[in-house]
Design a protein with these regions (language model features):
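Short conserved aromatic/hydrophobic patches within beta-strands of well-structured domains
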Residues: 168-179, 331, 335
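Conserved active-site neighborhood of the chymotrypsin/trypsin-like protease fold
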Residues: 1-48, 53-56, 71-74
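C-terminal cap/linker of serine protease catalytic domains
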Residues: 10, 97-167
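Active-site region of chymotrypsin-like
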Residues: 24-31, 55-130
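Short, well-structured beta-strand
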Residues: 139-142, 263-339
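Secretory pathway targeting signatures of secreted, lumenal, and periplasmic proteins
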Residues: 177-242
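Conserved positions in beta-strands of structured domains
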Residues: 9-11, 64, 82, 179
């Protein structure tokens, strides 16, 4: 293993695309040619890999274009990628590499990194004229550029809204953050009425086995007491409010501890003497190896004397301080429970 490592040298990396460029001193067979154009929709493809450590395996499938619901481009490959095939090439009928195996959603729904990511990485290396000396710094630069582009796109859009109970919440902003929700309105046995809405991005940027970033998630909950007394209802509200977690994972080697700021507000009702009690919690943890990047977790909860409650929440992974502040301001300006 040591001799193998000594004969290879990292020359470039694209963390979002999950591809790297290596230089080897070994004598290698002729490289596989890289496709210069995308295949036609429905073209046969052949994925190569070592599934479950069973040896070199060829898996046939079909090209179904670039997934339009992913922020980072991914080829939709209709074929069965399995554990052990990640990083292997997928070839066209003419033997050209059209993508790199990266993930599967099961039921023959799999994804490839487009070969364009390799073309871009090679072009970047040629323009630079030398290898990357500090890979941690380079990855940090790519992560910061990636989040800057993502949030500039988000802030440039109108954020659509929808009703959830008596509250106004944020609907699907962009295709790469899918939304779903539900309610218990059809249940006759429910102790309270509830409705919820969740939107979450499908793009994780892999950094290590226990560390990923790039996730965006926002959630809303509407609650109304029905059969619960006020004490029971408030206890459930408090339990739900404290049950949120970050959208990504990382160890103490990767991330600092969360630092949180809580604010309590009393918002007077316009129409009667009842009051709403509101709580905001804003938590931030820093990335140890990537300065100026943070994970952010935000919670807002409001409960009123008529035993109704509204909770909103978002989590952002790998975001700059400025973009986090802009997001929370925009979020609170759109998601609200009108008087």
């Amino acid at each position: 293993a040591q001799s193998a490592a000594a004969s290879h040298r990292f020359m470039g990396i694209n963390q979002e695309g999950q591809v790297a460029l290596l230089q080897t001193q070994d004598t290698m067979p002729s490289p596989l040619p890289l496709a210069m154009v995308e295949p036609d929709m429905g073209s046969p493809l052949f994925a190569l890999g070592n599934p479950l450590d069973l040896g070199l395996t060829v898996v046939p499938g079909t090209y179904n274009g670039v997934n339009q619901t992913s922020y980072h481009p991914r080829v939709h490959f209709t074929g069965s990628l399995n554990a052990g095939m990640s990083g292997g090439p997928t070839l066209s009928e003419t033997g050209e590499v059209v993508g790199i195996n990266v993930s599967t959603a099961g039921n023959q729904v799999s994804f490839l990194v487009p070969v364009k990511a390799l073309h871009n990485l090679r072009a970047e290396h040629r323009a630079r004229g030398q290898g990357v000396s500090d890979f941690t710094q380079r990855i940090g630069e790519q992560l910061k550029a990636d989040q800057a582009d993502k949030f500039s796109r988000l802030f440039a859009l109108e954020w659509p809204t929808m009703s959830l109970g008596s509250a106004q919440v944020i609907a699907e902003i962009v295709p790469f953050a899918k939304c779903w929700g539900g309610s218990n309105s059809a249940s006759e046995k429910a102790q309270f009425r509830s409705a919820d809405r969740t939107c979450r991005s499908e793009d994780n940027i892999y950094l290590s086995g226990g560390f990923n970033t790039g996730v965006m998630e926002y959630q809303f909950f509407w609650l109304e007491a029905d059969k619960l007394n006020p004490m029971q209802f408030y206890a459930y509200y408090e339990r739900l409010f404290g049950d949120f977690a970050p959208g990504n994972k990382g160890s103490e080697e990767d991330l600092g501890e969360y630092r949180c700021d809580s604010q309590f507000l009393a918002l007077a009702e316009n129409r009667n003497s009842d009051s709403r009690k509101s709580k905001n919690v804003f938590c931030v943890r820093a990335y140890k190896d990537f300065p100026d990047l943070y994970d952010v977790l935000f919670l807002h909860g409001t409960v009123d004397a008529s035993r109704a409650a509204f909770i909103s929440h978002f989590t952002l992974a790998g975001v700059s301080q400025n973009n986090a502040k802009r997001f929370v301001q925009r979020f609170l300006g759109v998601a609200k429970w009108p008087s």
